[in-house]
């Protein structure tokens, strides 16, 4: 639902997020040629803490995988992803180009503590074929060319098996 319009160049939408009060979160269209919605959190709204959230479902999404759309509601697997991100040891991997960042795979995790929004850790395969997961990507403005960086954690055998299933 559009709740406002913004912008000096044309008109872009500010929208309510289903199941979220507009005093907590809204989505704004920050795209230029096409819609690109970004979530904005009110400064008085505490940040979502994925480390302590109870997730109910996760979906693997990848532009290039044949099993994109793979879902799980297994509480043990969901807890393993959170524990891996929270407690795992990050590895240093080469940065990812902007073009490569556009095709990154994610795990979309849904929680009743954040209705209408998702926590989306990113995935990649390392040079040695190992699967890695990270909480988020960071844009490195100091590199040439510009690259995405992350704190990459090797995926557990159970997570790797689930991601390769189907």
Indicate residue ranges for each PLM-predicted region.
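Function-determining sites in protein domains
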Residues: 1-166
């Amino acid at each position: 639902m559009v709740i406002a319009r913004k912008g000096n160049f044309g008109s872009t939408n500010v929208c309510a997020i289903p199941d979220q009060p507009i005093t907590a979160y809204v989505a704004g269209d920050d795209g230029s040629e096409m819609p690109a919605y970004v979530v904005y959190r009110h400064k008085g709204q505490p940040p979502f803490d994925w480390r302590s959230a109870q997730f109910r479902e996760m979906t693997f999404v990848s532009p290039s995988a044949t099993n994109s759309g793979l879902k799980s509601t297994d509480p043990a697997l969901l807890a393993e992803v959170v524990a891996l991100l929270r407690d795992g040891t990050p590895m240093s991997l080469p940065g990812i180009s902007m073009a490569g960042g556009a095709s990154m795979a994610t795990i979309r995790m849904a929680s009743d503590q954040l209705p209408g929004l998702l926590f989306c850790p990113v995935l990649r395969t390392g040079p040695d074929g190992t699967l890695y997961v990270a909480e988020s990507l960071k844009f490195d403005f100091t590199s040439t060319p510009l690259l995405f960086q992350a704190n990459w954690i090797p995926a557990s055998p159970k997570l790797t098996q689930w991601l390769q299933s189907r």
